[in-house]
Regions:
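N-terminal active-site segment of His-dependent metallophosphoesterases
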Residues: 15-78, 223
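CN hydrolase (nitrilase-like) catalytic-core segments centered on the catalytic cysteine
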Residues: 107-136, 204-306
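Active-site beta-strand/loop signature of hydrolases that rely on acidic residues for catalysis
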Residues: 60, 68-98, 134-136, 203, ...
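A charged helix-plus-loop insertion that forms the helical arch/lid used to bind
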Residues: 94-111
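Conserved hydrophobic/aromatic positions in well-ordered beta-strands
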Residues: 47, 153-155, 287
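Active-site catalytic loop in hydrolytic enzyme cores
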Residues: 141-237, 242-253, 318-328
Length: 352
């Protein structure tokens, strides 16, 4: 970047002011950033794992077990891990056989994986006074069709986690080398505190999916698991503008847009730090965005951290009521309607 160019710094959250920084403490060796949203203790407490999964299944499983114990200690009700947190992320075609072998040995029914997952499940509760739900990203082997999917599973005490899953629909070009596209079937979860929809990473870039969840399924909150990268450059030389971490910028933008456009909460758990196989970085910043589009709390962009947001009033701030503290003056339900698929009026501007 030349000396007179201006750099857009992606690790500053423009326009969002906070009087006090969230408390950060060490719990069992993990940094925990802890905030409280409301005084309504009947609302759920979320914990988001902003972590760096390795290409090492045993390490990842041990890491996950430790974080689950932290969730118990801090009183979290819902714990969200990032995408492919058991296998580690995929990389290039030169190592395709190695990646495929890793994926095959990390699925939920592999003995060592199943042992850990079943142990976590046995510690869950079926009420609101403890950890009762865990979202985690892993490989799903569809043996009936011989397909491998990049999936998010939902673990509760009373159900088989292999039965509650979402297969990622919008795969990146790299992911298409290793996974099959999901079937377009969304996953909607009804809980006492509200209705949840599940998305994964690149899904955030496709607005139709969020719209379907919000206006057809009427969810209150979107849960997104991700392995979202940080670095790529966008530059406008004549304006002397450059951003080196464009993907990080988009991570924030997409969550804010998803929340504000659809008047839902957006909660994202992302990988963070250097990806050992490529040297590239994941942008972290796992966080919570309110229906206003404003980020309420987020994790580090460069190191592992656990985010806790207590007593999150999901249903009390959903889009139907339009009582969230934002500047929309019109109620979505009174104004919004689907746009009919009719031909546009086209006008030729002669000479222009």
């Amino acid at each position: 970047m030349s000396g007179n160019q201006r750099e857009i710094r992606a690790n500053t959250w423009a326009g969002v002011k906070r009087e006090d920084e969230p408390t950060v403490t060490l719990v069992s060796g993990y940094k925990v950033r802890d905030v409280t949203f409301s005084k309504n203790e009947a609302c759920p407490t979320f914990m988001l794992a902003n972590i760096n999964p390795r290409f090492d299944i045993d390490y990842n499983l041990s890491h996950i077990e430790d974080i689950v114990q932290v969730a118990h200690k801090v009183g979290a009700n819902i714990l969200v891990f990032p995408e492919l947190c058991i296998s580690g992320y995929v990389w290039d075609t030169d190592h395709k056989a190695e990646v495929q072998e890793q994926l095959k040995t990390s699925h939920n029914n592999q003995p060592e994986v199943k042992k850990v997952l079943d142990g976590i499940k046995s510690g869950l509760v079926d009420h609101d006074k403890g950890l009762n739900m865990v979202f985690f990203g892993n490989v799903r082997m569809d043996r009936s069709h011989g397909k491998i999917h990049d999936s998010t599973f939902v673990m509760t005490q009373g159900a088989d986690y292999n039965d509650i899953f979402y297969d990622k629909i919008f795969l990146t070009p790299m992911e298409k080398l290793f996974f099959h596209r999901g079937s377009d079937r969304r996953l909607v979860l009804d809980a006492r505190f509200g209705r949840m929809g599940v998305m994964m990473c690149y899904d955030l870039c496709f607005v139709e999916m969020g719209k379907m969840y919000a206006f057809t399924d009427e969810v209150d909150v979107m849960i997104t698991t991700a392995a979202w990268r940080m670095e790529t450059v966008r530059e406008y030389p004549l304006l002397k503008l450059r951003i080196d971490n464009y993907y990080q910028f988009i991570w924030r933008l997409m969550h804010s847009a998803l929340a504000a456009h659809n008047q839902v909460w957006s909660i994202g758990a992302n990988c963070v730090g250097v990806f050992e196989k490529t040297g590239g970085r994941f942008c972290g910043e796992s966080g919570v965005w309110s229906p206003s589009g404003i980020p309420l709390v987020h994790a580090s962009h460069d190191e592992e951290e656990l985010i806790v947001i207590r007593d999150l009033e999901i249903r009390g701030h959903m889009r139907h009521q339009a009582k969230e503290h934002f500047d929309y003056s019109l109620d979505f339900d009174e104004v919004y309607r689907a746009i009919k698929n009719i031909k546009p009026k086209r006008v030729s501007l002669d000479g222009l």
